[in-house]
Amino acid sequence: MKKEFKLAVLPGDGIGPEIMAEAMKVLDAVEQKFQVRFERQFANVGGAAIDRDGKALPDATVEICQASDAILFGSVGGPKWDTLPAEERPERGALLPLRRIFGLFCNLRPAIVFPALTSASSLKEEVIAGGFDILVVRELTGGIYFAQPKGVEGEGGERRGFDTMAYTDAEVERITRVAFDAARKRGKKLVSIDKANVLSTSVLWREVVERVSADYPDVVLSHMYVDNAAMQLVKAPKQFDVLLCPNMFGDILSDEAAMLTGSLGMLPSASLAEGSFGMYEPAGGSAPDIAGKNIANPVAQILSAAMLLRYSCGLADAADAVEKAVENCLAAGLRTGDIYQDADGEQLVSTSAMGDAVVAELIKS
């Protein structure tokens, strides 16, 4: 089994550098505990890269990523760069090109409510008692966001805006197999999201998903219209295990599912290419208002590193250990400000203290 890995580390803007520092501590501990090695190359991205190199994704950063087994990404953006043209701002100028260059067609967004944090959710306790763990599998490079033609035509009050929604058999089959593989390793339940009652692309989507399901007889497949799925996520989220979504539907539902957990600071994500390459990042933003104050929640960045261990390095045992260490810290009452409720048994801790606690749990496990 491979024991050495090359990682491109892109801390970015806002809280990115400080939460990334905690993820680096955790990877140090993984090296020690599991006898592996991570060669880490740090590179600029986002606003930090604009300030230094003139663009959000410098060529040097791309080269470092191309020479790596995976990318661990922090966060980008902030009001400092909001006056730039939209395509030059940190978010669009860095993330979209990275997805295109590396063929990142699949987005995995876990939405996890840990048993110790059910009170932080916006849902009633009886709806989420014991917590839940949902994985949203979103197709990332097709659908209405990318298909052509699109644009605005005409003048004055007669203008017309238009977009095209399109999927091919191959695009749907590729993402469907990722979702079935994930479901097979989890609760063996897959819900495919579409709008097949009105959209031709969804008719194709459903037909392909049904065809692929024959290769996964151990996974229970069901279909759900996207409007019903949005309602069911709020009404009874524990019914779901893996959700398979086209691009736009996954964009919306993954954010909805994420907010049910109480804080974006808890949630990781992975964007995967074919093979083992992927980019891993927190689901939240750069939070420039709290940057540098040592109060940001590093858990999403740490869990993103755990996803990197699982999907790009094949180190499932290490990933499990990191995730369990995080769960143990939360069960012990440790809370950063975003999830602190001043309840009995809770202890307010800093960014660095939370990282140190996860490392301590990991080492002793």
Curated annotation (Swiss-Prot):
EC category name: oxidoreductase
UniProt: NAD(+) binding residues: 78-91, 285-297
Residues where Mg(2+) binds: D227, D251, D255
UniProt-listed Gene3D superfamilies: Isopropylmalate Dehydrogenase (3.40.718.10)
Alphabetized InterPro entries for the sequence: IsoCit/isopropylmalate_DH_CS (IPR019818), IsoPropMal-DH-like_dom (IPR024084), Isopropylmalate_DH (IPR004429)
Signal sequence range: none
Pathway linked to the protein: Amino-acid biosynthesis; L-leucine biosynthesis; L-leucine from 3-methyl-2-oxobutanoate: step 3/4
UniProt GO molecular function: 3-isopropylmalate dehydrogenase activity; magnesium ion binding; NAD binding
Name assigned to this protein: 3-isopropylmalate dehydrogenase
Organism this protein belongs to: Syntrophotalea carbinolica (strain DSM 2380 / NBRC 103641 / GraBd1)
Gene (UniProt): leuB
